[in-house]
A protein has these predicted regions:
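Hydrophobic alpha-helical segments
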Residues: 1-190
Length: 190
C-alpha cells in the first residue's frame, strides 16, 4: 500500500527537515516514513519531534518493559503496522525479549508476562477500546503498583500511542522493515 500523502522528497524539504531526516537516519538506519509524510507541515513535524524527545526523556517512572509493552499493545489494537514494526525495533534496541510479543494476545494467562506487565497491558486495552473501559478499581490497582507518577506516565504513553497509531493508519503509513532490519520503503531513500 502506498501512503495517502506522498512522502515529501528531499528536493522539496526545508533545510530543517533534511537535518531532522539526517539525524533519524543515523539513529535508526533509515528515515522513518511518518517523518517524510509529516514533512508536508514542517511546523507540526517539528512540534511532534520535540514532543517525542521530551516524552522519551521524561518517561522513567515505569520499567521500560511495562511502558513499551503497553505502547506495543495499543499500536497492535489500533492496527498500525508501522507502529508495531518501529516499536519492535525500539524494544530490540533496548534489549527486551521480543519473543514475548508473540504471546501478547494471551498476556492474561501467559507466564511470559509479570503481573505488572499484565496490569499495564489490560489498561492499554481499556483505554484503547472505544468507548474506553477504564474502571476506578483498575486505576487504584495501578496506583498501588506504580504510584501516581507511574499511572500518569502509563496513561500519557498509551494516549500518545493512540494518536500516533491513528494518524499513521489514517495516512496509510504501513510497516517499513525496521523490526526485520530491512528498512527501505521510503521511495527516494532506495
Amino acid at each position: 500500500m502506498t501512503t495517502r500523502l506522498e512522502p515529501l522528497s528531499p528536493a522539496k524539504a526545508s533545510l530543517m527537515t533534511r537535518l531532522m531526516w539526517r539525524y533519524t537516519k543515523r539513529r535508526f538506519g533509515e528515515v522513518p516514513e511518518p517523518f517524510a509524510v509529516y514533512a508536508h507541515h514542517p511546523g507540526l513535524m517539528l512540534a511532534g519531534a520535540v514532543h517525542e524527545g521530551m516524552l522519551d526523556r521524561a518517561s522513567g517512572a515505569l520499567p521500560a518493559s511495562v511502558r513499551q509493552l503497553a505502547v506495543y499493545r495499543t499500536a497492535r489494537t489500533v492496527g498500525c503496522s508501522w507502529c508495531v514494526d518501529f516499536g519492535s525495533m525500539l524494544m530490540r534496541m533496548d534489549g527486551l525479549d521480543l519473543d514475548r510479543l508473540q504471546q501478547i494476545d494471551a498476556y492474561a494467562t501467559s507466564p511470559h508476562f509479570s503481573d505488572d506487565e499484565r496490569a499495564a497491558i489490560a489498561y492499554a486495552d481499556a483505554i484503547t477500546t472505544d468507548p474506553h473501559a477504564v474502571t476506578d478499581e483498575q486505576v487504584a490497582d495501578l496506583r498501588k503498583r506504580f504510584g501516581d507518577k507511574g499511572v500518569m506516565e502509563l496513561t500519557y504513553q498509551i494516549g500518545v500511542e493512540n494518536m500516533r497509531a491513528r494518524m499513521n493508519t489514517a495516512l496509510g503509513i504501513t510497516e517499513q522493515g525496521f523490526s526485520s532490519g530491512d528498512a527501505c520503503r521510503v521511495p527516494w531513500a532506495t
